[in-house]
């Protein structure tokens, strides 16, 4: 792996859990997990290790290089109206197949999408390396960062714009 990233997650559901665990296994540091349900954040943080902070408000997340917004599509608009990352140069990434990249551009100068093409279940083990992942970045540097991040957990990673991703998601 070329670079190890410091990452914080907003969301603790099935996708967040699988992605966070696999990113950590790949050598990245998961600094914090935020969830509306504190017990879910604590459960995931415990699985990720002693240094992972669990909070119930994303405003309490520690400063990170990358913030992954792994929450329900319908919860995203409320989040981007009420939250900004503590690190203004942070890369803010959502994981939705149906939400455009433009929708989060007010959160940071550096935004992107990391979309794993998979339905995630809590108790079903997955080989994340076999899951196709699609990325889109606000600029070429962000796209390259997301390609590197996604390739650390998946063997099948490709760039894909919002319109084609939405079609694929449906």
Feature roles, as predicted:
Residues 1-56:
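NAD(P)+-binding Rossmann beta1-loop-alpha1 motif at the extreme N-terminus of oxidoreductases
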Residues 3-6, 89, 130:
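Phosphate-coordination loops involved in phosphoryl transfer and adenosine-cofactor binding
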Residues 8-9, 69, 135:
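Hydrophobic Val/Ile/Leu positions in short beta-strands of Rossmann-like dinucleotide-binding domains
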Residues 14, 39-40, 74-75, 99, ...:
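Short alpha-helical
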Residues 17, 42, 77-78, 102, ...:
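Alpha-helical elements of the RecA-like P-loop NTPase motor core of helicases
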Residues 28-29, 109, 155:
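Short phosphate-binding/catalytic loops that engage adenosine nucleotides
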Residues 38, 48, 52-125:
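Rossmann-like NAD(P)(H) cofactor-binding subdomain of soluble oxidoreductases
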Residues 40-47, 125-169:
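Internal alpha-helical scaffold of NAD(P)-dependent oxidoreductase catalytic cores
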């Amino acid at each position: 792996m070329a670079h190890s990233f410091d990452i914080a997650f907003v969301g603790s559901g099935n996708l967040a859990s699988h992605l966070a665990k696999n990113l950590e296994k790949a050598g990245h540091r998961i600094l914090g997990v935020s969830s509306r349900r504190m017990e879910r954040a604590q459960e995931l943080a415990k699985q990720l290790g002693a240094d992972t902070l669990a909070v119930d408000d994303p405003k309490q997340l520690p400063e990170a290089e990358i913030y992954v917004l792994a929450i329900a599509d319908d919860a995203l608009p409320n989040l981007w109206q009420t939250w900004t990352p503590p690190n203004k140069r942070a890369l803010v990434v959502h994981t939705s197949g149906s939400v455009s990249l433009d929708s989060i551009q007010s959160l940071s100068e550096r935004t992107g999408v990391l979309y794993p093409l998979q339905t995630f279940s809590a108790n079903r083990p997955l080989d994340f390396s076999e899951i196709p992942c699609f990325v889109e970045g606000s600029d070429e540097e962000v796209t390259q960062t997301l390609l590197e991040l996604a390739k650390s957990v998946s063997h099948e990673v490709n760039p894909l714009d919002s319109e084609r991703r939405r079609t694929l998601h449906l």
